[in-house]
Amino acid sequence: VKKQGNLSADALQNLLQRLGIRELQQKYPDQLSGGQKQRVAIARALYTDPKIVLADEPTAALDSDRVKEIGRLFADLAKTQHKAIIVVTHDLRLRQYADRVYQLMDGKISRKAG
């Protein structure tokens, strides 16, 4: 992996390890499963070390274990690196990792929690 983002080489390798894609660095996109592509997309979004992350359905195509890993990763980034992580999802399993949850109904906030 060539260094082009804002993360150090060690931080990048740690991120790839946490996402379970470190071993995929030499593969071509057409060799990846849907879930692997999703995790690569998350790594690409985090590679520039943004202060705000807007993730639209970040757990699509992921199994339950990977959903937990992504939830823990986002929660950890919010707490330790003070990042704002905004997740738009239908996957209610991610609620447990959120500080606040807003439910939308007909384009309006219908419920707040947290």
List each model region and its residues.
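Conserved catalytic motifs of ABC-family nucleotide-binding domains
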Residues: 49
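Conserved ABC ATPase signature
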Residues: 28-32, 36
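Helical segment within the ABC ATPase nucleotide-binding domain
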Residues: 68-80
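Helix N-cap at the start of a conserved alpha-helix in ABC-type nucleotide-binding domains
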Residues: 64-66
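Hydrophobic anchor residue at the start of the ABC signature
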Residues: 42
